[in-house]
């Protein structure tokens, strides 16, 4: 489990390798990750967009930007949480992900909430970084 907190917004990520959706002979490794976003602050916020930086085991960077997460732009009041699970295919048995969520307060102020850097690793495969 990996965790970051920005301005009272806690982001926790739990990744896992999904063997049944992977095909190592075809250089396809699929990882799922579950994210829990908790508003520990005093103000209501809305998740507006996401920005991911995905780096495979060869060092190739892919950036992904988009509105919301899993088709939603959740609003979180103080003490509320939102969880979702998504996935990421890689051409290597390991890599990393990190990023930010753009959050907006009720008065229209925007800020970036950090998504912690986390590793994607096939169990029992030695990690080689380039």
UniProtKB/Swiss-Prot annotation:
Domain ApaG: 3-127
Coiled-coil ranges from the UniProt annotation: none
Domain of life per record: Bacteria
Pfam families from the UniProt entry: DUF525
InterPro entries associated with the record: ApaG_domain (IPR007474), ApaG_sf (IPR036767), Uncharacterised_ApaG (IPR023065)
GO terms classed as biological process: error-free translesion synthesis
HAMAP family: ApaG
Cited PANTHER family: F-BOX ONLY PROTEIN 3, POLYMERASE DELTA-INTERACTING PROTEIN 2
Protein name: Protein ApaG
Source organism per UniProt: Methylobacterium sp. (strain 4-46)
Lineage: Bacteria, Pseudomonadati, Pseudomonadota, Alphaproteobacteria, Hyphomicrobiales
Gene name as annotated: apaG
């Amino acid at each position: 489990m990996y965790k970051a907190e920005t301005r009272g917004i806690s982001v926790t990520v739990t990744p896992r390798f999904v063997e049944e959706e992977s095909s190592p002979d075809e250089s396809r490794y699929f990882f799922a990750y579950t994210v829990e976003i908790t508003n520990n602050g005093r103000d209501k916020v809305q998740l507006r967009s996401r920005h991911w930086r995905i780096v495979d085991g060869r060092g190739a960077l892919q950036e992904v930007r988009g509105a919301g997460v899993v088709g939603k732009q959740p609003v979180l009041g103080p003490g509320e949480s939102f969880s979702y699970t998504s996935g990421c295919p890689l051409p290597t048995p390991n890599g990393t992900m990190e990023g930010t969520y753009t959050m907006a307060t009720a008065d229209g102020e925007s800020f970036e909430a950090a998504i912690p850097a986390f590793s994607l690793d096939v169990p029992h495969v030695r990690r080689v970084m380039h």
